[in-house]
Each structure stands twice: as structure tokens, then as C-alpha cells.
Amino acid sequence: MALIPMMTAYENVEFVLRLAGYKGDRRKRTEECLKLVGLGSRMHHMPQELSGGEQQRVAIARAIAHKPKIIFADEPTAELDSNTGLQVMKIFKELIEKQGVTIVMTTHDTGLMEIADCIYHIEDGEIADED
């Protein structure tokens, strides 16, 4: 999901918490999530001031902010360099193992497959096989 262009990275994450009716400290949770994805120093930047990879990480922070039980992620590491992609993979793995979050994702990144419990290969819009 695209970021709201007239809101800072911080505001993009905090807005979702307001919409979800988050009962905790929204400021603290917003800052935690942005720091978790390595953007603590960029939280007051507008989306157009962020690289594609940084924007992707803001979207991930926004997705995890309200502590969902399930996350749908379409190519979550697509615009990230390999080191940042590994960082995102670690975050997802921790969410799965420590918080019991289910993550359903599409990806071409075979590295992400190592955290998967179930893998479906799709060819021409059809499930070709299951691992």
C-alpha cells in the first residue's frame, strides 16, 4: 500500500494506529516500529524525501504497528538492498516466532522461503506445486 504523500513517515504509521483505535501510547509505538525497521532518524521525512527502500520499510512499520495477527505482504523486499532485505526477514521471523503472527506473502526472493511453513509456486495464475 502506498504511503500518504502529504504525511511524514511518522504520521503515516501513527495514522494507522488512530484508525485501528490503538489504546496504548501511539507516539511510543510509532517510534518503536520505525526504529525496528531502521528509520528512527528518518521518521520526520516526507515520502518523496525517502528512497524506495525506505518507503517500503515505512509501509512495513505501518503494517506491524497495530500488532495484527495476520499480515499480507506483496513483495516485501522488492525495493530493498540485500542487507535491508535480511533485516526485514529477521523482523518477520521474530513476528512469527515470538508473537504468533501469520504472514502471507508473495515474493520472488528465495531467501524469504526459509522462514515459510508452506510454499505455493504459481505459474500462469495457477498453483503449480506446493512445498
Model-flagged regions — what are they?
Residues M7-E14:
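Short coil-to-helix segment of the ABC ATPase nucleotide-binding domain corresponding to the Q-loop/switch region
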Residues D25-V37:
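ABC nucleotide-binding domain "signature" region
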Residues I60:
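Hydrophobic anchor residue at the start of the ABC signature
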Residues I71-D74:
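Catalytic Walker B motif of ABC-type/P-loop ATPase nucleotide-binding domains
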Residues M46-Q56:
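Conserved ABC ATPase signature
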Residues S82-T84:
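Helix N-cap at the start of a conserved alpha-helix in ABC-type nucleotide-binding domains
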Residues K67:
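Conserved catalytic motifs of ABC-family nucleotide-binding domains
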